[in-house]
Regions:
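P-loop NTPase catalytic phosphate-binding loop
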Residues: 1-103, 110-176, 193, 218, ...
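Conserved P-loop NTPase
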Residues: 179-238
Length: 238
C-alpha cells in the first residue's frame, strides 16, 4: 500500500493521505479561484510519482488549458461526451484487480451536465448512468472517476441510487454554498470552536476521506500552475 498526499491538516499540520486503490473516486468542489485545478494537479502528481501504470483520460469541458498535453486521451467541450463513452468501454473490458490505474478526470462536470441536458436530455441521462456505474463498480477494476466542479448537486447523477456516496474522497474548497456543503459533508463537522472561526481562502477547505473524520485541508501553495502542468507532461511522457 502506497499513500498519496492530498494536502495538510490545517489544525495539526500533519499530511492528509489516502490509499488510491481503496479511495480512488474523487470529487472536488469550489468556486472560481478556490484552487480546484491546483488540488487536482497536486494529487495527480503524487500518483504519477508513485505508480508507472497510470492511464489518464481528461475531459476539460470549458477549455481551461490546465491539463493540455498531460495525456493524449484529452478532449474539450462537446468531445467530452465521446471521451466518457470511450472510458466506459475500456472499463467494461478491464478485469478485476487490473494492475493499471485508469483515471477519468472531468473538469467542470456540473457545467458539462447542464449543457448536455439542454442539448440532448436522453444522451445526458445515458452519460449520467455510465458515470454512476463507474462510481459503483470501477474501484475493483481500478477505474476511477474524478469530478471537478463549482457546485455539488444530486441532480448531476441518476436519482435514487446514491451515486455521490461512492466518492471516497470529497474535497470542498473555499466558501461552499449551503447546498454543496450539505451534499458533500452532511452530518459531518469540525471542532466547533475551530469551525466557527474558519474562513477558508484559496487552497483551503474541507476534506472527507472514506474511513477518516472531516478535516480542514490546506493544498500546498503552487505559484506557477503552468510549471506544474509541465512537470506532469514530463511524468506522463517518461
Amino acid at each position: 500500500m502506497a499513500l498519496i498526499n492530498l494536502g495538510f491538516d490545517l489544525q495539526n499540520r500533519f499530511p492528509i493521505q489516502a490509499d488510491i486503490f481503496r479511495t480512488g473516486h474523487i470529487c472536488i468542489v469550489g468556486g472560481t479561484g478556490s484552487g480546484k485545478s491546483i488540488a487536482t494537479l497536486y494529487i495527480l502528481y503524487g500518483i504519477l510519482s508513485l505508480y508507472h501504470e497510470v492511464q489518464l483520460y481528461i475531459g476539460d469541458f470549458k477549455k481551461s488549458g490546465d491539463y493540455k498535453g498531460i495525456t493524449k486521451s484529452f478532449e474539450e467541450f462537446e468531445q467530452v461526451t465521446g471521451l466518457i463513452e470511450k472510458f466506459y468501454g475500456i472499463f467494461e473490458e478491464t478485469e478485476e484487480n487490473s494492475p493499471a490505474i485508469k483515471i477519468l478526470i472531468l473538469d467542470e462536470y456540473a457545467g458539462f451536465i447542464t449543457w448536455l441536458t439542454q442539448k440532448d436530455k436522453k444522451k445526458c441521462e445515458e452519460i449520467k448512468g455510465k458515470i454512476a456505474n463507474l462510481l459503483m463498480l470501477g474501484r475493483s477494476r481500478h477505474c476511477y472517476v474524478w469530478c471537478i466542479q463549482q457546485r455539488m448537486s444530486a441532480q448531476l447523477f441518476p436519482s435514487g441510487i446514491g451515486a455521490i456516496d461512492n466518492f471516497q474522497i470529497l474535497i470542498g474548497l473555499g466558501r461552499l454554498s449551503v447546498d454543496s456543503r450539505k451534499s458533500l459533508f452532511a452530518g459531518e463537522h469540525l471542532d466547533k470552536d475551530f469551525e466557527e472561526g474558519y474562513s477558508p481562502i484559496c487552497g483551503q477547505g474541507l476534506i472527507l476521506v472514506d474511513g477518516q473524520p472531516l478535516r480542514a485541508i490546506q493544498i500546498p501553495f503552487i505559484k506557477d500552475k503552468g510549471r506544474m502542468t509541465a512537470l506532469l507532461r514530463k511524468k506522463t511522457n517518461q
